Amino acid sequence: MIVFVSDQGQAVKFYSEKLGFDIMVNMPFKGGKWIEVAPQGSDTTLSLMVPDGKMLPPEDVEAAKNDIGTSTGIWFYSDDIHSEFEELKKKGVDITVPKQQDWGGFMSQVKDPDGNTFSIISSP
């Protein structure tokens, strides 16, 4: 999954230091950098990409820039969303208080420094 960001260095710092993600890939690529991060123990990675002509075809750059600061549609599962909320809040992460959903579980919203939004959910 690709998450478009304005500054890869800032994004890597946030995802690794604040969210505790592992840096899976960080290498030069096409004049830029290819960076992938993942929650600890996960096989699924997020590619943190600056939307510029180095990594994308020129005709896709503007649309990708418009994706920065929007909902990613990505959900992460937590066994203990309330403890996760407290831990992330202490680290200065922009996170909403977990709210119980109609289906019985809880959900929080997290924003990265660019305003890209993710959901954290837990089972009822």
Language model feature labels by segment:
Residues 4-8, 102:
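Conserved beta-strand-loop-alpha-helix junction that forms the acyl-donor binding cleft
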Residues 22-77, 82-111, 121-124:
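Vicinal oxygen chelate
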